[in-house]
Regions:
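Conserved, well-structured ligand/cofactor-binding cores
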Residues: 2-207
């Protein structure tokens, strides 16, 4: 969500306050605050970290490599921030439900939540495109990290799609529900073949 939300009076366990152990324990709770949407952003950050490592292993003397490293490092920090932003947004959403707001008002929150996790989806598409643009310049010893970034990044995209599937069950109207599901499906399908080829290319460079 792009709007500023006053969450000072709400009790929120933020990702930034947790260790990996605590975060994964929260994810495992059936009624926990860490949803698939939070996991998608965390996975995206891991993919970005691996991509940055691959670029740094390969050397940043080339302008394209340096630009890619800077852009993906910014994305890594953005994805981590998104984990907490989504938690804060849902805290406000839960408050609206508790206060008995109208269904239309609550559905507005659902659509806003979708917009927020979409930034993970499209940010990851841009990230993998950046890896592809410099793939010929990656050192062989960096390609395992780069290939893993592609694979893990695609998992983050699938998590966004599945979270949208869940969100689609919270709104009324078949058209709206279908549209909420179809957007990530189409975005992922549009790049699947290309990303599979990139993964194979990077894997082959390890031989």
């Amino acid at each position: 969500m792009n709007k500023d939300i006053d969450v000072s009076s709400l009790k929120i366990d933020l990702y930034s306050d947790k260790s990996v152990r605590d975060f994964t324990a929260d994810v495992a709770q059936k009624d926990g605050r860490m949803w698939l949407s939070n996991v998608s952003a965390e996975i995206a950050a891991e993919a970005a970290a691996l991509a940055v490592k691959a670029l740094r292993k390969s050397g940043l003397g080339d302008a394209d490599m340096k630009n890619a490293e800077h852009f993906i490092e910014v994305l890594r920090k953005f994805f981590l921030k998104t984990v907490d932003q989504e938690l804060q947004s849902r805290a406000e959403w839960d408050k609206e439900v508790a206060e008995g707001k109208s269904q239309a008002y609550i559905e507005g929150g659902v659509f806003a939540a979708c917009s927020e996790i979409d930034e993970v989806l499209y940010g990851m598409i841009k990230l993998i495109d950046m890896i592809e643009s410099v793939s010929d310049k990656l050192a062989p010893e960096a390609c395992a990290d780069a290939a893993a970034a592609v694979s893990i990044g695609r998992s983050a995209m699938e998590c966004v799609k599945l979270q949208r599937y869940h969100y689609s069950t919270l709104i009324t109207g078949d058209v709206n529900s279908m549209a909420m599901r179809r957007e990530p499906e189409l975005a992922i399908a549009d790049c699947t073949e290309r990303y599979e080829a990139l993964y194979k290319k990077l894997q082959d460079k390890l031989k």
